[in-house]
């Protein structure tokens, strides 16, 4: 495999999200196979949430051992817990409430009304 980055163009955002989800699932499964667990840093926004929805909809999602996956956030809005504008709230709706994640391995950033 080459270390040279490749530009991959998809005809629409749905296909891009599906392709990214397929690649991410492969990377997670590979990491879990070689290291026992995997960590992923999430972001919000249309593309980030589209990726999470594509992960949730993918039949290949069953290849992931969700109990051995740590989720972190690269950014977050400093709003009250449950606010629909928080990235973690959107991630819960798109993926986290759909797959059997270990809640102890979901590392959300603090909310404005939390500890």
Kindly give the residue locations of the regions a language model identified:
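Short beta->alpha linker loops
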Residues: 11, 46, 112-114
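Generic structural signal for well-ordered alpha-helical scaffold segments
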Residues: 21-29, 56, 92-96
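Residue-level signal for inorganic ion chemistry
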Residues: 24, 45, 106
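N-terminal glycine-/serine-/threonine-rich phosphate-binding loop
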Residues: 1-40
């Amino acid at each position: 495999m080459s270390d040279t980055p490749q530009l991959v163009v998809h005809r629409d955002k749905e296909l891009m999200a599906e392709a990214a989800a397929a690649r991410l699932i492969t990377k997670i499964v590979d990491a879990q196979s070689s290291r026992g667990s995997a960590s992923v840093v999430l972001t919000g926004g249309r593309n980030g949430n589209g990726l999470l929805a594509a992960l949730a909809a993918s039949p290949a999602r069953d290849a992931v051992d969700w109990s051995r996956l740590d989720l972190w956030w690269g950014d977050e809005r400093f709003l009250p817990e449950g606010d629909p504008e928080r990235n973690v709230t959107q991630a819960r709706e798109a993926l986290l409430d759909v797959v059997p994640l270990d809640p102890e391995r979901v590392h959300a950033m603090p909310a404005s009304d939390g500890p």
